[in-house]
Amino acid sequence: MIFGIKAQKEVDSLGLHYELTPTDFTSKVADCYDLYFTGVHESKIYAQLLLPKKSSAKHPVIFQFHGYHSDVGDWLDKLAFVSEGYVVVALSVRGQGGESEDCLQTSGGTLKGHLIRGIEDGPEKLFYRAVFQDVYQLTNVVSRLPFVDSSKMASYGVSQGGALALVCAALCPKVKRTFVQYPFLSDYRTAYGLEVTQSAYEELAYYFRYRDPLHEREEAVFAALDYVDIQYLVDRIQAEVIWAMGLEDRVCHPKTQFAVYNHIQAPKKLYFYPEYGHEYLPKFNDKIHQILGGK
């Protein structure tokens, strides 16, 4: 079972209710806005939106997604892309470090993280199902804004954000390029069998330790997580995929990343960093800039 048409139809039934209001942050190159829209479970979802200053033209878009537990970051971080003519939209993942609400009702434990949120209620109550739906709704809203050229869209993210950048490309065929670094949310069985307590997947170990110490529900747990395993979504991607991987990564192990990369049928390029782990990967942002047309 994978994230499918039913989940997208639930989002489509919400309509496109959003608010776009100027923010207090000012810039000589960008007009900056707070974007709020209605997500599933009546949650109010937030994103930063920046566009080239006082421009009446339509612009290409780059969607940005942040790492696990974090937030959208500073406005300043996005100005480089805006100065090159892009609209930048940075999603605040529900229930994490930013302003987005998470009104999903679940039972069971959530110790140590969101990956197991809703796991005892079945795949349709999983936290990340709602997050994937938010990503889909974000693309619906942004692609219809009057200053957006929806034929020129890209996505970018690191770790959790890398996973969501791939989800964005999978659920929105208008996305033409996606740039990712060491994405999270993949190949949960393999991740659990590795150094799980030192990884982004450590909450799986805590779940079994405290909620299912005899592993009587193990098969049901992993079957539910298949629903939000990005390796089963990425075959939908039509965009070009540019990927960076640190071969010493033990937070999102290369084995779990290859499970995803190998399922991508679209054009793709993988950059290896043999001496690097789950950390800043130099030169990759410069490559993104060059690929997006800043040569």
What are these model-predicted stretches?
Residues 73, 79-82, 86-133:
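Cap/lid segment of the alpha/beta-hydrolase catalytic domain
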Residues 47, 51, 57-68, 88:
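Short beta-strand element of the alpha/beta-hydrolase
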